Amino acid sequence: MLPLYRFPQEASALQERLVRHVSFDEAAHKAVDEILAKVRQQGDRAVLNYTEQFQGVRLTSMQVDEEAIEMAYRHADPSLIATLHEAYANIVRFHEHEVERSFFYEAEGGVLLGQRVRPMERAMLYVPGGKAAYPSSLLMNAAPAKVAGVCEIAVTTPCDATGVVNPTILAAAKVAGISSIYKIGGAQAVAAFAYGTESIPKVDIITGPGNKYVALAKKQVFGHVAIDSIAGPSEVVIIADESAHAEFVALDMFAQAEHDPDASAVLITTSESFAQAVQQAVASLLPTMLRHETIASSLLHNGAMVLVPSLDDACAVSDMLAPEHLELHVVQPWDILPKLKHAGAIFMGSYSCETIGDYFAGPNHTLPTSGTARFFSPLSVRDFVKHTSIISYSPEQLRSKGAQIAAFADAEGLQAHAEAVRVRLKTL
């Protein structure tokens, strides 16, 4: 089921199969462009029409009332609520370490310079709905926004055909202290919050994963609002040596593959016998999985095993893929960590499975995909703040440096820039 590649002999074939890029087909572009245009022109009417078309329900109100949120929280399994609270506390605690402070300093000659860090005013957090509920996505998006100090936070998630939002998502919203929840999804939800409608406020940033239409809509509205990233299918790379446990690896690969047939799971190992053991574990465990068809399709079309001569080569292959998740099932994971350059999150050792990061540990699970870990980072407090430079020159400081500054502007051929300095020098 999982094709085996030998590196470096089959490097080109491996790259062709596994190197992924964010791309969208022409039909998706056409559909999303039409949705964005109609929502921008027609506001609520277009959003309600698209919700009826895609979600199968004609809403009379797009917002979830607070009573429904309270009821979902009260009726939820108490042990789940306790876990949600503990997980959220872990996520908040991690993101508190990311908080940046404004700074000022006195430069040469008494010039005052600084940078002010301020939270964005409004954020929309998109939480996927449909076949599965993702309260973890709500917690992961809410925590950095809250820690950053965003004033108004709205969540939107698709309701079902009866107009009801998954109660576990509502309970998670209560845990995160969010009461502004909308029950719309898809590109129409992205458009509504990017442009604003009669009943939906325009926001400053949209974050959170979704299907290809949500991802493309976020890409298209960037510039009207900020976005976190453009999410593609989920992916994991596992580097393993002969000390690894085959069932651990097989189930960790399944954990990615069960998301989506387009998800990718790749094992890179120095041991051919271990690769064979994982193949056997996959064959044995697959029939026991509830989503065995999705897993099988994902592994068949987007999975692989890569046999490498050394762990240094394993690191090179991983960096070529720049995966969303990277697990290190090796004797000394900390020894190879410095050799790895590109990954959204790295899980150290056989007992640090990716599931822990998805739900509980604290670092954000909203991660760069499709090779974008080469230049993008996990969702963080930094996504929800903006930076403003502060510059203060006194008359004396301008008198000292003004001629130099004006000459610099002259060198660029920008007369008005230069004269804006010289006119001030004439008053000194």
Curated annotation (Swiss-Prot):
Biological or metabolic pathway of the protein: Amino-acid biosynthesis; L-histidine biosynthesis; L-histidine from 5-phospho-alpha-D-ribose 1-diphosphate: step 9/9
Binding site for Zn(2+): 256, 259, 358, 417
GO biological process: L-histidine biosynthetic process
One GO molecular-function entry: zinc ion binding
Positions contributing to NAD(+) binding: 126, 188, 211
Required co-factors: Zn(2+)
Cofactor: how and how many bound: Binds 1 zinc ion per subunit.
Primary enzyme class: oxidoreductase
InterPro entries registered for this protein in UniProt: Ald_DH/histidinol_DH, Histidinol_DH_CS, Histidinol_DH_monofunct, Hstdl_DH
CC per GO annotation: cytosol
Amino acids binding substrate: 234, 256, 259, 325, 358, 412, 417
PANTHER family tied to this protein: HISTIDINE BIOSYNTHESIS TRIFUNCTIONAL PROTEIN, HISTIDINOL DEHYDROGENASE HDH
Protein family (similarity comment): Belongs to the histidinol dehydrogenase family.
Function: Catalyzes the sequential NAD-dependent oxidations of L-histidinol to L-histidinaldehyde and then to L-histidine.
Protein name stated in the entry: Histidinol dehydrogenase
Native source species: Chlorobium chlorochromatii (strain CaD3)
